[in-house]
Structures are given as C-alpha cells and as structure tokens.
Amino acid sequence: WVRDNTQGIGTLTFVDQNGKYGALGHGISDVDTGELLHIDDGALYQAQIVGNQKGSSGSPGELSGLIHYEAEKIIGSIEKNCEQGIYGKLTDMSGLSGLKKMEIAYKQELEIGPASVLCCVDGEIREFEAEITRIDMNHEDTNKSFVIQVTDPELLDMTGGIVQGMSG
C-alpha cells in the first residue's frame, strides 16, 4: 500500500532571510511502521494552537491545534524529510512579522546555562526562560545532543515543560 498524506502540528526551528526553513527537529515517520517517510513534495499549512494537554511524569502532554487545509492557508512547501526534521521554503512569511531576528549557533557553540525557547501555547508566539543542562556531542542520536529544561514558571504552569508539538 502507499501512504499519500501525513499531518501534524509542529514548530518551525528556523527561517532564513530567503524563506528557507527547518522544522520539527525530527523526521516524519510512518505511524504504522515507524519508518521515516519518503516525501517527494508537500505543503506547509498555517495552523492554529487552540489548547494543550499538560505533561506529567509518564505522560508527555501535547499541543492541540487546527490545521487549515484551504489553498489560501498554504504558507510553504515541504521539500525534504530526514532524521533531523523537515525542510522547505516559506511562500508566506507574514506570520513572522514582529518577531525579532536571532543568530543561530552551531551545536559546537552550545554552552550549559540560561537559554530561551520561543513557542506558541496560547495563540501567540512568546519567549520563555529555559536552561541547557547537559551537552553530549557524541550522542548516537544527533537529535538528542543536548538537554534543555524549561524554567519559566508561566510555561511550566501551562504545559509542565516541553510537550509534543514543541519539538523543533
């Protein structure tokens, strides 16, 4: 059989000045086999976060959202799916207006200490306090080379920490 579509709510990791983006921080896998999906092309849609399930010990929690599948809600293309995430080009960057530009760092530039995470848990992209607590450049899974812990009381109250849908 052939899987002809997939869907989910996720986080943009970065967008450069030309609209090229990376998202999720992990690849999209087949729900039945666990295998990484081969994606020839796809569309990135605007989504609306409508709530979240707070995470707790043994329960990861998750963001809940609506994906608007109308043609006018397409905000970009998906050109690549790999173990590190999905990559493509945004065609509509209006949702990013008002956000401050930030420099990205190579993983070898990471340092243990204060950090921040940008995420949308209540309909608005906001910055929250966090801390990088461990760095492991030799981890067998390159997606798990550092540990970040949410320290922001407001985000902890809302979500309990990092929940599904925030990866990226």
Report the location of each language-model feature.
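C-terminal recognition in membrane/secretory proteostasis and scaffolding
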Residues: 1-168
